[in-house]
UniProtKB/Swiss-Prot annotation:
Residues 460-657, 664-761 have a biased composition (Gly residues). This is Keratin, type I cytoskeletal 9. It comes from Canis lupus familiaris (Dog). Keywords: Coiled coil, Intermediate filament, Keratin, Phosphoprotein. One of its GO terms (molecular function) is structural molecule activity. The lineage of its organism: Eukaryota, Metazoa, Chordata, Craniata, Vertebrata.
Length: 786
């Protein structure tokens, strides 16, 4: 349930009287609630604020719509509560009981169907005879009692629903709390432990594999190093072999030389032996002749001995050379072996040192790899932990956001229910005031009728004229005379305040009078809820009316009549020179403008109308709205949501009002909206004024006023809406919860009113009903004495 649906249910009633009821809260230009059937005492009709010719139609009717509580035969009946037709002429009033049909009176040449129009309690009081309520007093009061009982039943039902909702909220919090803070994660512990063990085992296997790879790499490096060493040794041995091969070649050359020398010596020896044999043979041959020759000669050399000596000498030289060569070779070989051994030892020591260094490097690399692996594993573990906790944190944040959203929804529902409850309390208060007002009307009605002249017109209508025309409904007055309405009347021509006899009369919710008189120059016709007269005259509707031409049921300088939901007045008259009528939701009109409906109201030429939720006054006057409102210095009135104005101070220059939530305006004034609003300068919407709407809105400078969803106004003026309204330029209209007058007068509204500058508004035992925090006493009995 939201506020819009509740307001719709407020406009309907599931009584046993018929099938009337609203379907939805549809604020458009032609209807306020859904279609209805006939028969319901408080069922909504086709239009809550729209008339038979539209909410603010030029053609006629339609200020309050076709009915307040029902269609044909239901609620407050069809008809126009504040409707007019083109400048007050030919207008018709609204009905009160179910199926009353006709209005309470017509305006300026128009005639109403009386109190018992078609479908009502007879043919009507067309010729001016009959009482206020006639024989149907008990029926009317019983209807009001049944309405009050239905409201009390609704209040009780809403309280029960509120308690049930609170219990559901507590249960929900208990469930959500236990679900959130006692969640069991124990089934996941084993899985988490297994995953951790798997991670540790896989990490250990990876480290072992890395160590095996490092060991294999080290073994490969050792083998490669040994291979390099063997290659170096092989190259060194090859170099030694090459060096020894050179020595061997030298020795071979020497050997070949010696062999050649030996061969030459052998040949020489052979040649010598051969020569020796030849010589021996020659000598032997000579001896064979027995020739002896003796000579005394020196002895010859012994060649054999010489040869032998030479041979021995050469052999000795050869042996010596061989020995020297062998010694030299052995010496060189020993030196080379020593050098090779020393270089081998150095190489071996260097190799060992290199091997040790390589082992140390490999160990350090292995340790570095293990540390890096450990670091990466720790980083991965840290990242996994962060991701895990981030996911948990995100889940918790989502849960918190969802809970906050649910809390916000619940708070909104509770706030909406509080507003509904406050609205019901306000309705109950208004019903109490309505019952008191009815009682006072019943008690004082007969006296008012007896005090009037016999030539007074009937209750539902009165013709108006200029230059001494007829007075209001229930009395006439002209040029000093006075005409009062049922709730009051107005007088002019220097008359005095008070109801009938030249005084001033209030509307149903209040009225105003002035020293210069109201209803001047032709007087005015009042309405059941109040009215005003002017030079051309007009009559109000059930909720009120307006006047113009310098005189009205308001003040001398001008006045206004409130409507059921509100009306408007101004220094030159609200609805002046063509005038306007207020509507249940509020409306305004001026300069031949149009009357406002529940859906919207519009006015021009410096006029404004109040609204259901509030109204405004200016020019030294103040008004309060349903939720409160204030005006000053041509300021503006508040709306249901509240509003305030300035320009002479909040509540300055004569008075102030309060708003439901608060708002402000200044300069030419403005109207607040349901939640409050503000304007400044020459007014929100410009040129002196603005109009508030249920949802908020403003109009100015020929703009459009506010309806149920918006308001319209022109010429620097504004029209009120269901949620609020405002007046500017020294003009203001009353609203359902309050009203105000300005420019020397004020117009009363159903909930009350005020006037200033020589005029005051009067209500009949009416209190301004604002938001009430107290509880509704459902056990209180409401018994009405008939």
């Amino acid at each position: 349930m939201n506020c819009r649906q509740f307001l719709s249910s407020h406009c309907s009633r599931d009584s046993s009287g018929g099938g009337g009821g609203s379907k939805m809260f549809s604020c458009n230009r032609s209807s306020f609630s859904g279609a209805s059937g006939g028969g319901g005492r408080f069922s909504s009709s086709r239009s809550f604020g729209g008339g038979s010719s539209g909410a603010c139609g030029r053609g006629g009717g339609g200020s309050f719509g076709s009915s307040y509580g029902g269609g044909s035969g239901g609620g407050f009946s069809a008809g126009s509560f504040g409707g007019h037709s083109r400048g007050f002429s030919g207008g018709s009033g609204g009905g009160f009981g179910g199926g009353f049909g006709g209005g309470f009176g017509g305006f300026s040449g128009g005639s109403g169907g009386g109190f018992g129009g078609p479908g009502g309690f007879g043919s009507g009081f067309d010729s001016g005879a009959g009482g206020i309520l006639g024989a149907d007093e008990k029926t009317t009061m019983q209807d009001l009692n049944s309405r009050l009982a239905s409201y009390l039943d609704k209040v009780q039902a809403l309280e029960d629903a509120n308690k049930e909702l609170e219990s559901k909220i507590r249960e929900w919090y208990d469930k959500q709390g236990s679900r959130t803070f006692h969640r069991d994660y124990s089934p996941y512990y084993d899985t988490i432990e297994d995953l951790k063990n798997q991670i540790v085992n896989i990490t250990a296997d990876n480290n072992k594999t890395l160590l095996d790879l490092d060991n294999t790499r080290m073994t490969l490096d050792d083998i490669r190093m040994k291979c390099d060493i063997e290659n170096n040794l092989r190259l060194a041995v090859n170099a030694d072999i090459n060096g020894l091969r050179k020595v061997l070649d030298d020795l071979t050359m020497q050997k070949s030389d010696l062999e050649m020398h030996y061969e030459s010596l052998q040949e020489e020896l052979i040649a010598l032996k051969k020569n020796h044999e030849d010589e021996m043979s020659q000598l032997t041959g000579q001896n064979s002749g027995d020739v002896n020759v003796e000579m005394n000669a020196a002895p010859g050399r012994d060649l054999t001995k010489i040869l032998n000596d030479m041979r021995e000498e050469y052999e000795r030289i050869s042996a010596k050379n061989r020995k020297d060569i062998e010694e030299q070779y052995e010496t060189q070989m020993s030196q080379m072996e020593q050098e090779v051994m020393s270089s081998g030892q150095e190489m071996e020591s260097n190799h060992k040192e290199v091997t040790q260094l390589r082992h140390s490097i490999q160990e350090m690399e292995i340790e570095l790899q293990s540390q890096l692996s450990k670091k990466s594993a720790l980083e991965k573990s840290l990242e996994d932990t962060k991701n895990h906790y981030c996911g948990q944190l995100q889940q918790l944040q989502e849960q918190i956001r969802s809970l906050e959203g649910q809390i916000t929804e619940i708070r909104g529902e509770i706030e909406c229910q509080n507003q509904e409850y406050s609205l019901l309390l306000n309705i109950k208060t208004r019903l109490e005031q309505e019952i008191k007002t009815y009682r006072s009307l019943l008690e004082g009605g007969q006296e008012d009728f007896e005090s009037h002249e016999s030539g007074q017109s009937h209750f539902g209508s009165g013709g108006s004229r200029q230059q001494g025309g007829i007075g209001g409904s229930h009395g006439r007055g002209s040029r000093g005379g006075s005409g009062g309405s049922y709730g009051g009347g107005s007088s002019s021509g220097g008359g005095s305040g008070g109801s009938h006899g030249g005084g001033s009369g209030g509307s149903y919710g209040g009225g105003s009078s002035s020293g210069g008189g109201s209803g001047g120059r032709g007087g005015s016709g009042g309405s059941y809820g109040g009215g005003s007269g002017s030079g051309g005259g007009s009559s109000g509707s059930y909720g009120g009316g307006s006047s113009s031409g310098g005189g009205s049921g308001g003040s001398h300088g001008g006045g206004s009549g409130g409507s059921y939901g509100g009306g408007s007045s101004s220094g030159g008259g609200s609805g002046g020179r063509g005038g306007s009528g207020g509507s249940y939701g509020g409306g305004s009109g001026s300069g031949g403008g149009r009357g406002g409906g529940c859906e919207e109201g519009s006015g021009s030429g410096g006029r404004s109308g109040g609204s259901y939720g509030g109204g405004s006054g200016s020019g030294g006057g103040s008004s309060c709205s349903y939720g409160g409102g204030s005006s000053s210095g041509g300021g503006s009135g508040g709306s249901y949501g509240g509003g305030s104005s300035s320009g002479g101070g909040s509540g300055g220059k004569g008075g102030s009002g309060c708003s439901y939530s608060g708002g402000s305006s200044s300069g030419g004034g403005s109207g607040g909206s349901y939640g409050g609003g503000s304007s400044s300068g020459r007014g929100s919407g410009g040129r002196g004024g603005s109009a508030g709407s249920y949802g908020g809105g403003s109009g100015s400078g020929g703009g459009r006023g506010g309806g149920c969803e918006e308001g319209s106004g022109s010429g620097g003026r504004s029209g009120g809406s269901y949620g609020g309204g405002s007046g500017s330029g020294g003009r203001s209209g009353g609203s359902y919860g309050g009203g105000s007058g300005s420019g020397g007068g004020s117009g009363g509204s159903y909930g009350g009113g005020s006037g200033s500058k020589g005029g005051s508004g009067r209500s009949s035992q009416v209190q301004s009903s604002s938001s009430k925090s107290g509880e509704c006493d459902d056990t209180q009995g409401y018994h009405i004495q008939y």
